[in-house]
A protein has these predicted regions:
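ATP/NTP phosphate-donor binding region
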Residues: 1-106
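Fold-independent oxyanion-binding glycine-rich loops
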Residues: 31-32, 54-55, 83, 110-112, ...
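Short glycine/serine/threonine-rich phosphate/pyrophosphate-binding segments
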Residues: 34-37, 59-62, 89-92, 114-119, ...
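Glycine/threonine-rich beta-strand-loop-alpha-helix active-site module
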Residues: 90-97, 101-192
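Carboxylate- and glycine-rich phosphate/diphosphate-binding segment that chelates Mg2+/Mn2+
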Residues: 165-272
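C-terminal catalytic subdomain
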Residues: 272-341
Length: 398
């Protein structure tokens, strides 16, 4: 009955999705493209940008160059640089309050997933002042025009610069605010901003992008020709460039390719959705503070294996794009999963998450099921018991 209800919901949502106003940000890409933010502000008559960025980014030479350009144009910045990993409801409220106090007119977000999530959630809160942040959680709860968002990713992973989602942590529980109005108007993909990333962060965020692409590609009802093409492009690019970026952090070509792959994967899952990996990963981040990319890197091969034959045809196709061989769909699909594991190992990504406590697994399974069902159009609908089995496998690494 649960599976029937989920599939019925997904079919209806897929029909309705064709009538939603999907859009993609206008993109500026290439080394030094951060300075295009000044042009964007000037062309749109925006004079008081609210910057959300880490202290490290604010001290970076590229940001200082942008700041000097904006000073020459008498554009006054308000800066918030206190976003924690996994932004909290309290941080979102602080950003919204300071934005109002400083009478800002847009957001300029420079950073990884946490600053992006915090700024987008604050934008939702500003658009809906009568609602609390938790009340905005879920799908299409905002439905108002938000302040203009200019997104500048410094990691190649979340794809938040093109997605509808902002993930917030409330206590030990993570949830997403998802609405089309949260898709940024502009995305700036400047590879010079990501050359200083540590190898571990490069690996984990890159595997997050791969998870986005694969989950979008496996989507049963929400997929379109465009999302399939974007997901395929992202998968091929990630396998070609992620390990090279991991080994040589200064390679602008590989950093640029990964930023584009992350953007493509984000655009794919914005329309086609994520899946059960993300449902579990959010519980790991909320309960234990496990970095989102690390959680997805560990979960991706485990869940793909658990899907079994339901995922073989599409995984086999992805394997073919990578030049992996096999006589049957099953052997090609398993070769693709094996290649994910091999890439994880080459980048020193662990194969288990031993922070998971046995007594927490039922709660994690319940949270994951509540997030995934009925919305996520996964190859196999999981109930709480099946989520619990996969979480146990993630704990043991088998």
């Amino acid at each position: 009955m649960n599976t029937f209800f989920c599939r019925a919901f997904q079919c209806c949502f897929a029909v309705g999705a064709h009538f939603l106003p999907w859009r993609r940000p206008k993109v500026y890409a290439g080394p030094g493209s951060l300075l295009r933010a000044a042009d964007i502000l000037r062309e749109n008559g925006l004079r008081r940008p609210f910057v959300v960025a880490s202290r490290r980014q604010c001290a970076d030479e590229h940001f200082r160059a942008l700041q000097e350009t904006l000073d020459e144009q008498d554009i006054l910045l308000s800066i918030f640089s206190a976003v924690e990993t996994d932004p909290s409801v309290e941080t979102v409220e602080r950003i919204a309050s300071q934005y109002r106090l400083d009478r800002c007119d847009c957001f300029l977000v420079i950073g990884g997933g946490s600053p992006m999530d915090a700024a987008k959630a604050a934008a939702a809160r500003l658009a809906r002042p009568e609602k609390t942040v938790p009340q905005l959680g879920g799908l299409l709860k905002v439905r108002r025009r938000v302040p203009p968002l200019i997104a500048v990713p410094t990691t190649a992973g979340t794809g938040s610069e093109t997605t509808i989602a902002a993930v917030v942590t409330d206590g030990h529980h993570k949830y997403a605010i998802s609405d089309l109005c949260l898709i940024p108007r502009y995305a700036i993909l400047d590879p010079t901003l990501s050359t200083g990333l540590p190898p571990r962060i490069t690996a984990e965020t890159g595997m997050d992008a791969l998870t986005h692409a694969v989950e979008a590609y496996l989507s049963r009802f929400y997929n379109t020709g465009m999302t399939r093409a974007l997901a395929e492009s992202a998968v091929v690019a990630i396998f070609a460039h992620l390990e090279r970026a991991y080994r040589d952090g200064a390679s602008l070509d590989d950093r640029a390719a990964m930023l584009q792959a992350s953007f493509d994967a984000g655009a794919a899952f914005t329309r086609a959705s994520v899946g059960n990996m993300h449902a579990i990963a959010h519980t790991l981040g909320g309960l234990y503070g496990v970095p989102h990319g690390l959680a997805n890197a560990v979960l991706l091969p485990l869940v793909l294996e658990d899907y079994g034959a339901a995922a073989y045809p599409r995984l086999a196709h992805l394997a073919g794009l990578l030049g992996l061989k096999g006589d049957t769909e099953e052997t090609r699909a398993k070769a693709f999963i094996a290649e994910i594991r091999a890439m994880n190992a080459r980048m020193n990504v662990p194969d288990r998450l031993d922070c998971i406590r046995d007594e927490d697994i039922p709660l994690m399974a319940r949270w994951a099921a509540q997030e995934a069902n009925p919305v996520y159009p996964v190859p196999v609908i999981y109930d709480e018991a099946r989520f619990a089995r996969v979480i146990e496998r993630a704990r043991r690494g088998v």
